[in-house]
């Protein structure tokens, strides 16, 4: 007899992780496979980041961390957001988690109630709708085709918003299409969202440095909706640190406090050693991003 919870029974397995596992199994059998499943950088974690982690181990930096992460890492993230994105946050507006994936899920779980609608532009990362369903919400899919560069328009967004809409998940640069919203395109979406203050934006910016232009624009830059935007980012893609599992949100303090409350009851703070590595990554960020990302553009 299946006695699992209803929420788990309606949850689909991660398609990307299943594909990755299958790819690894075929490779182990000697099959030549090109793995296009998970977003795994081809380069290695930069040496200065690894050295910071080694030092943390030698210094016995191995205790439980505060739930939102150590202040040093959160302050490094605040500086990154200011220097790279021109955005002003405080350490109290940052919450670190076990990867950006958990950060997305934390935010959805903190905001979404039973029956709330969450707008998800398609094509989308496969976990978005499943996370919404896990929170008892309803994913509302907006399809953006190749003729519009896989990016939704303000008219599409306006048409999708209802009294039940709680959030929009916006991924730019996009996983899986690679499409990047321009500042002008984001301004158009922001103008629509400003008319609907009950709608929050979960801005997944984990691929911000994986672009051909090298220029990333955040929807959080627009003052009229800034307080309704929750940025999600982390070290996995830009610094080849997928296995270190450090992500974060930046947003209104009341949402960050709610996420901390939630995270405190199931995973607590992220790995202490990984936090020291991430702190080193953000402290010297742009210096060590440019060369690997240049190779990705070739």
Model-derived features: where do they sit?
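N-terminal small-domain helix-loop-helix segment of the aminotransferase-like
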Residues: 2-99, 106, 281-284
């Amino acid at each position: 007899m299946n006695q699992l919870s209803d929420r788990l029974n309606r949850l689909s397995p991660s398609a990307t992780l299943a594909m990755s596992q299958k790819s690894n199994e075929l490779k182990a059998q000697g099959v030549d496979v090109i793995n296009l499943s998970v977003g795994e950088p081809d380069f290695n974690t930069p040496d200065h980041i690894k050295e910071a982690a080694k030092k943390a181990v030698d210094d016995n930096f191995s205790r439980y961390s505060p739930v939102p992460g150590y202040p040093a890492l959160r302050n490094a993230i605040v500086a990154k957001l200011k220097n790279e994105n021109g955005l002003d946050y405080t350490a109290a507006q940052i919450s670190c988690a076990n990867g950006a994936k958990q950060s997305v899920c934390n935010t959805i779980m903190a905001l979404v109630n039973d029956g709330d609608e969450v707008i998800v532009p398609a094509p989308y990362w496969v976990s978005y709708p499943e996370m919404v369903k896990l929170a008892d919400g309803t994913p509302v899919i907006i399809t953006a085709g190749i003729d519009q560069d896989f990016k939704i328009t303000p008219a599409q967004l306006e048409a999708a918003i209802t009294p039940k809409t709680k959030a929009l998940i916006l991924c730019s640069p996009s996983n899986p299409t690679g499409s990047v919203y321009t500042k002008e395109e984001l301004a158009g979406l922001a103008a629509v969202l400003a008319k609907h203050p009950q709608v929050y934006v979960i801005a997944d910016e984990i691929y911000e440095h994986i672009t051909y232009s090298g220029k990333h624009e955040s929807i959080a830059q627009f003052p009229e909706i800034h307080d309704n935007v929750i940025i999600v980012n982390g070290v996995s893609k830009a610094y080849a640190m997928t296995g270190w599992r450090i992500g974060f949100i930046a947003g209104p303090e009341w949402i960050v406090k709610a996420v901390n409350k939630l995270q405190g009851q199931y995973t607590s703070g992220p790995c202490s050693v990984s936090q020291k590595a991430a702190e080193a990554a953000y402290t010297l960020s742009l210096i060590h991003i440019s060369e690997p990302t240049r190779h990705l553009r070739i």
